């Protein structure tokens, strides 16, 4: 029964992955049995061939040839069949692993997926604060790419989110379309993984594709490629007809072999520097072929496929042609064949010229093709994320600056049974939410929940909300500032630099969505209060929007100065029967209960009653 037929009865992602695991496991068992049977047949035919040679050794040449053909020919056919079965086995094992990983991901276990920790950057405007990269990060939850360029693309999207309504809606449409193509996403990922489409040296390939093709313009190259085979033909014909001695042919032939050593360096450099890297383009060719077979509904996906077109043909053909030309360079490893080909036609020089001609014709398109495949790969990941969360909703992107209205919003990385959902309303510009509350009451989690959902919305993904409407301004946060020993920079100064950056961007007219946690943490209370109050007043003057969490209840008085522009909310800690509890539900107003002294007493620290 086909996967499509099965899907008619499947209602959840968990059912789908379980179904694929069951089907793949059954087929894998069958393939392994076939491999075993073929192995036994190969042994049988090989032994039969040896026996036939011994038995019919004196029976005549034709009988011996016939016996050998009846045994060794099937043996060779079985080798080819065996190789196909092993390739199928690798495909199925990868497919099984991918579906098992997705099933674990649905349970919140992302340990099998790439953390993207190389992208972590404390200086980034928001990625470090929102835990976008690293263990149990948003990147680890989303990234399912099978190409290095795809992985880089997702990281780039997360670090430089979209801020235009039209572009976000086009991305949303593409993610929706991709999320519905379960088999395509699975095949794309399996194919990329099996074929090791991991080009990690894009810049080297870019340099190669953009470098001048000097050999094509060299006169000596043209003369050598035409002259060497022509001279060989003339001398060989002369030797055969008796017009000259065959020794002349042999002497000149060996001279050509020696000369080839002098010019072989260029071929060796091409092979060593780019050979293995360029050969992986074959896997990109297969991914391109797979993508072009689909009929896409989304405009963005149609545009990407249109980019995978050159003179009415698929670039897959050109990439496979390059792969074949590079494979032929490997003939130099066969010493006997190498000597014959070099002496006859300057084979390696000829191959390098063919590769240079390919580069001259297609080189300017190469990076565009790879980047397009990388974007398709990234969209596959976003589509998988959307499919895995059918309860999420696609946000409505507003033209009204500024707006952020969320209903029942939760953190996408928090287990559903532990996730307490809250609303958020920022209806206009300028406008700030001031969030007060006790320690551990949920303020920081609330800020990250807003930040992560805001980012998901701005990269075209569905969000962990019942409903979300937002205006896509540039996100900037200050939640987790740290000391810098290498820069001799204090905690307080590091935060000041971040705040100055925000003010500078606002003065430049940038539209920002600002999320701050506990402003001016590194200074004394009086300074902190005055500085915080003045900073928020400046935000109001600069028409800014955002959310600020604080322990300082005095900031709640700003709502009296800006009754239409600032709103107070809080997370309360409830103390009952000498026990502390948290509801993690957002409430209107300024927090009334603080828990620091209570917790200190619980830990055995003496607190003097007033």
Question: Can you name each region flagged by the protein language model?
Answer:
Residues 1-2, 547:
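A composition/secondary-structure signal for short, hydrophobic, low-basic-content segments
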Residues 2-438, 445-475, 497-498:
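Alpha-helical coupling/stalk and coiled-coil linker elements that connect catalytic or binding modules
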Residues 263, 382, 388-610:
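ATPase nucleotide-binding head domains, primarily ABC-like/P-loop NTPase cores
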